[in-house]
Amino acid sequence: MINPNPKHSDEPVFWGLFGAGGMWSAIIAPVMILLVGILLPLGLFPGDALSYERVLAFAQSFIGRVFLFLMIVLPLWCGLHRMHHAMHDLKIHVPAGKWVFYGLAAILTVVTLIGIVTI
């Protein structure tokens, strides 16, 4: 018999953010680390492609703000979700662990949003 009042879970939302953050961390973050962390300091990047003025102009544009927001927030959600489930797997039960980890991720998301808007 089908339960007429099924219990709804909030877990799909967190798994979605975890998956998006993991994908972003695997595809976009290594490219940014290569470009900004290795090629640029070694002088292997062409000309003024990443000059201060160009990077600032990009960061202040709408698409730049969205990119910076996603670059910070998605890996953050992925990491905190992973920490929450790692603690559970190791049988370390944090009181109200879901509220601690996901609440911290939500607070840091709001802080990031405020920071990105004020650039």
Curated annotation (Swiss-Prot):
SUPFAM superfamilies listed in its UniProt record: Fumarate reductase respiratory complex transmembrane subunits
Cellular component terms (Gene Ontology): fumarate reductase complex; plasma membrane
Protein's name according to its UniProt entry: Fumarate reductase subunit D
Organism lineage string: Bacteria, Pseudomonadati, Pseudomonadota, Gammaproteobacteria, Enterobacterales
Protein role: Two distinct, membrane-bound, FAD-containing enzymes are responsible for the catalysis of fumarate and succinate interconversion; fumarate reductase is used in anaerobic growth, and succinate dehydrogenase is used in aerobic growth. Anchors the catalytic components of the fumarate reductase complex to the cell inner membrane, binds quinones.
GO biological process, one term: fumarate metabolic process
Membrane topology (UniProt): Multi-pass membrane protein
CDD domains: QFR_TypeD_subunitD (cd00547)
Family the UniProt entry places it in: Belongs to the FrdD family.
Superkingdom, natural source: Bacteria
Bilayer-crossing regions: 26-46, 55-75, 99-119
